[in-house]
């Protein structure tokens, strides 16, 4: 295009010519910009080979691939969260006017504060995050948690408790990000249960790895970050596998309703519309989370008190029948196609779990069963109630209600208050009853959990029976 000669005051013909020229230049720029806008973005490119294969794979093949990727990803995450609980961390925090608080309890509380805060942040963050950013976000958050463990090894106690809060803060969002890859599919029940089994098995395994490192001479403060380093490469591999999953198909959306990010207004409207039932579920989940954290974080103290101080393998072997039982019990929900009936069946399974917790504790107190059957029974009863919250319960609830929502939102509402309640229970015991053994406190809390959750399960089932639709 030739350059425009400057002109002072163009006459009529020159003005028309200039206007025509400017119009053509403007049109050319618009067409160029439009061409750029029409260029395919990275997200619009053709699906990757693995994604294309998964889109047409059989349900069994898809479930095996997705289940392995999700299970192993969350399994690896536990290497950055739980190994420190197997250490003893001698010493106490002495604050004038307050009971002494052991360093181990301090570190558990500090991590729990970060984890609980993460759940509240996740209500917004996880429910609004676009699917294409999930994989990179998972790696970034777990990387930040590993850096916090490095800081834990460097800082002296009690200041190292700050690093445990920083460790829990990113890890609390991982579950919702991983589950986001799985929800809204016809096989979500199986995938969700498989994912949930990971936190039953992985906790014992990473603790066993931690105890092994301690036995080789690794200092207690360096053991957690060392375990994390061992799991770094597997984590990257399995997150990469997870990122290949295609979005739910049209058939998936027809069966389980469409899943979409929720705005703040949509989240508030959904919660208000179902508040009585959701409040009941959240309250009982607080008890389940507190009971689970007692059993998990102080597993070493519980097994030592029961006479298994010299058998570190019990931390893993006792969890295998629990995981298998929970997998069979909750996984059977997949066989029920009607979402309303499945929701009621889930409540029935969770109610049975409450009976198992209370009944096995009575038998243990009477001397009718030994410590191993009791710990396995209360563990199975606990996870029959706990696993559905993190897998099938909210996915089926959304489908039965016919609402466009995300299960991650509901999971994080429950988790946020669950971990807040868990920290409250832990602080109450550590400060209010420091001389009460962890075993005795756990036994009493088992009765409380069994009774209260049993009543709330019934109330929730009756409420949602009237709110949901068949199909």
Pin down the residues of each PLM region.
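Pair of pore-lining "gating" transmembrane helices in MFS-fold secondary transporters
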Residues: 57-82, 274-291
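Central cavity-lining transmembrane alpha-helices of secondary-active solute carriers
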Residues: 105-125, 324-329
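C-terminal ends and interior cores of transmembrane alpha-helices
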Residues: 142-156, 353-366
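Intracellular juxtamembrane helix-capping segments at the cytosolic ends
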Residues: 173-185, 385-401
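Transmembrane alpha-helices of Major Facilitator/SLC transporters
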Residues: 313-337
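Intracellular loop-helix junctions on the cytosolic face of multi-pass helical membrane proteins
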Residues: 21-22, 27-30, 36-61, 214-284, ...
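Glycine-rich segments within core transmembrane alpha-helices of 12-TM secondary carriers
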Residues: 189-211, 413-425
